[in-house]
Amino acid sequence: MATAKRSKAKAAEAAKTARANAYAADRAAAADVVRATKIAKRKAREAKKAAMTDTAKDKEAEEAAKTARLMAEEATKAKEAAEEARRLEDKETEWAQCEEELFASKFRRFWNKFYACRGRGITFHQTTSIPAMRYTFPASRDTPDPMDTLQFKSVKITSIKECLHWPLQVFGIVTARDILDNKRNIIFHRPRNSCQTITEEDPYLALTGPSRAIAVSIDLSYIEVSLKVKGTTKAEDKDLSDLIVTYRSGYCLTGVYPSRLSTLKLEFSHVSFFVEATICIKLTGGSWPIGFQSVFTVGTSTDDVLVKLLDSEHDGLPVDANGVTKLSRRVVSVGLEKFLKVQLMAISINEKQVIESSEATFKPERAGISLINLSLGFCSMEVAVALSCFCDE
């Protein structure tokens, strides 16, 4: 009996254990299913994301390829446009007879870009604001020094095209721009209503400048020529010469420059270690005789080419109410190691020869005024030379 009870108890315990094991197995299986489901879902999400990434990459690659094609097309169009622009520019400028004439057609745009548009407060047509004799009597704080300069001697029309005929009624402007202020320093200026008559026998412009000495440095500076021939009406005016000539230290040589309707010869020289000389000539006694042309020139001890200060061309001596001669030009440059020679001549209108002449020689200084009295037989004259160095303004 006792044995049967023990057997029954063991059977019950075994059944209970079996049920517990079955329950644990069910729970483990359920947990495995949940884990497997989560893993499957995660893998599915990763697969979907990877698929989306691949799609995006494919789309990006397609967009990049499209952009590259568009950029290539734009580059091709830009190249074609540049070639067309160069072709048109070549066609538009094929008339230019020299580089200086070609540069003239672009100079104003170039100048405005580098000077007017950089906050310097200057315009293309402004003339130099630096006067002659700026440092003839320097203040104690001033430190002017000699500089290199451009000595303008002459502008000659050496030839004209067949569509023009001598004499020419010429107007326009010749200027120099230097490093001191980059503004126009007038060499020649005639408005349309005050033309100069240029003949084949005397083809030189009547220069009236510079208003101060023209400085030269290693930086490029510019000579600007814009001359026209007057027609019956403004519409019939013709461009005689348009040039931009560059100059710098070591490169200031006389040159011949062809243009559409003429060829010009610009004669100038490079003066080293110079001072500016401003000349004043005054009639102090006697009078200029009738029938005599007045010609005043200036040069240096080593320069064969004279700068003409005055050529009355006709009878008389032009003076103001105080007897001061109305010189066409009054500013020249002279090296400190040279001498300045001023010559006064009275030329017979009828005989075309020098009847009276006198010459004054000056030793240049860095500053101050030198005076010499001259006599021409029929009158006496005082020659004053004001000397000045320069500061970079």
Question: Would you name each region that the model predicts?
Answer:
Residues P167-F171, R177-N182:
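Primarily extracytoplasmic ectodomains and periplasmic/lumenal surface modules that are beta-strand-rich
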